[in-house]
Amino acid sequence: MTRKQKRLAIIGGGVAFLTAAVLLVMFAFSQAVAYFYVPGDLAKADVAPGTRIRLGGLVEAGSVKRGEGRTITFTVTDTLATVPVTYTGILPDLFREGQGVVAEGAFVGGSPVFVADTVLAKHDETYMPKDVADRLKAQGVTLGGEENIR
């Protein structure tokens, strides 16, 4: 090989390596991202079964039911729509009806029930994450304690 051919081979190998690295990083990020939805958005969104998402809203009053073992079912609402949720595990201490919650998981097998593997409750009675508050406000839900939105 001439010097020119060697140089082209090295440059071509470097470009191929960088392309492969960028594709691997993009694939890893796409697998780690969980988009945020409120129940009213899910009706418009095309979320494929098995796709990980974060579902945020309020725990509907009277919807919390304890099943066998550590399985809990409850309903998340934004006052415009509701989504039934199933969670197996220990709920946060601040989890209760009427409080804000963010559940992370997926819809499994085309079922309308959201299967959560992580449930987060807001840390006091007035705090609400800004993205949850913005989504609820966009759908016309009035919020008390707006000075506590962070």
Swiss-Prot record:
The chain crosses the membrane at residues 8-28. It is found in: Cell inner membrane. Heme binds at H123, Y127. GO terms for biological process: cytochrome complex assembly. Residues 29-150 are periplasmic. Keywords: Cell inner membrane, Cell membrane, Cytochrome c-type biogenesis, Heme, Iron, Membrane, Metal-binding, Signal-anchor, Transmembrane, Transmembrane helix. It is a single-pass type II membrane protein. Heme chaperone required for the biogenesis of c-type cytochromes. Transiently binds heme delivered by CcmC and transfers the heme to apo-cytochromes in a process facilitated by CcmF and CcmH. This is Cytochrome c-type biogenesis protein CcmE.
